[in-house]
């Protein structure tokens, strides 16, 4: 489960993985509810750790670095690429550096003790609406859509409950596309159609709240471009084994 806000989601993933591989391998499920310094030592005798943790130490490179230190094999990306991929600001900078389009954004850093912004806050140089979200959270925790200046302080405060680094990003309405990568091969692109205007926590994890179209109805050219860009991101960050990349509306891509 882990100690992150996505504890319950991690447990769901763990049970799904266990169901998929039971009878094929000797399996021990471990519900990690403690800090990293209380990591279960019996895990260090494993041939392979299948990391099913979402968010926090499970995705930000901490668990990965711990397992590397003890020479334990594990699934997923290494500590360096995990840290990069979990940091939305850093990953967007890397995506931008290889000429892949990403929505415009600014980063706000906040002192965790005083709540004072550590950098001079400048109004974003793009029009409303904005997406305001923590820079290192998943499952849309702390995320808000802001339509005008008066809504911005509350949205920043909400995001600050989850992180001291907050992204204010331009909101681009349109299709929600995601592409999985396994090994060094892209999987069929999925289009997600949530019941709400936003693919929020409820739509992600409540049965029947979203429709998934597989494969997404896209031109061959668009499939090629999205798949190519997903692999470029994957390889540039240095991911391994598996990953997923989300893309906005095809008009933007």
Q: Would you name each region that the model predicts?
A:
Residues 1, 43-44, 84-169, 173-175:
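Active-site nucleotide/adenylate-binding loops and adjacent lid/helix of ATP-dependent enzymes
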Residues 1-93, 97, 109-120:
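ATP-binding N-terminal substructure of ATP-dependent carboxylate-amine bond-forming enzymes
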Residues 147-228, 250:
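Phosphate-binding site of ATP-dependent enzymes
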Residues 170, 181, 234-253:
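Conserved metal-phosphate-binding beta-hairpin within the catalytic cores
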């Amino acid at each position: 489960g882990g100690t992150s806000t996505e504890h319950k989601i991690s447990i769901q993933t763990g049970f799904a993985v266990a169901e998929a591989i039971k009878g094929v391998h000797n399996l021990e499920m471990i519900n990690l509810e403690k800090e990293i310094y209380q990591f279960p030592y019996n895990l260090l005798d494993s041939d392979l750790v299948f990391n099913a943790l979402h968010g926090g130490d499970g995705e930000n490179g901490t668990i990965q670095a711990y397992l590397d230190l003890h020479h334990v094999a594990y699934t997923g990306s290494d500590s360096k690429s995990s840290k990069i991929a979990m940091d939305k600001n850093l990953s967007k900078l890397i995506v931008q550096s290889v000429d892949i389009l990403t929505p415009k954004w600014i980063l706000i850093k906040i002192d965790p003790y005083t709540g004072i912004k550590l950098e001079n806050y400048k109004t974003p140089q793009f029009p409303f609406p904005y997406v305001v979200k923590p820079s290192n959270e998943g499952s849309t925790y702390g995320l808000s859509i802001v339509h005008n200046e008066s809504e911005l302080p509350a949205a920043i405060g909400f995001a600050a409950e989850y992180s001291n680094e907050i992204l204010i990003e331009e909101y681009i309405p349109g299709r929600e596309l995601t592409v999985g990568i396994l090994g060094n091969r892209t999987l069929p692109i999925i289009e997600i159609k949530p019941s709400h205007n936003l693919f929020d926590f409820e739509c992600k994890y409540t049965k029947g709240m979203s429709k998934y179209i597989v494969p997404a109805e896209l031109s061959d050219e668009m499939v090629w471009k999205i798949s190519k860009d997903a692999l470029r991101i994957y390889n540039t960050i240095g991911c391994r084994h598996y990953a997923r990349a989300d893309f906005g509306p095809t008009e933007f891509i």
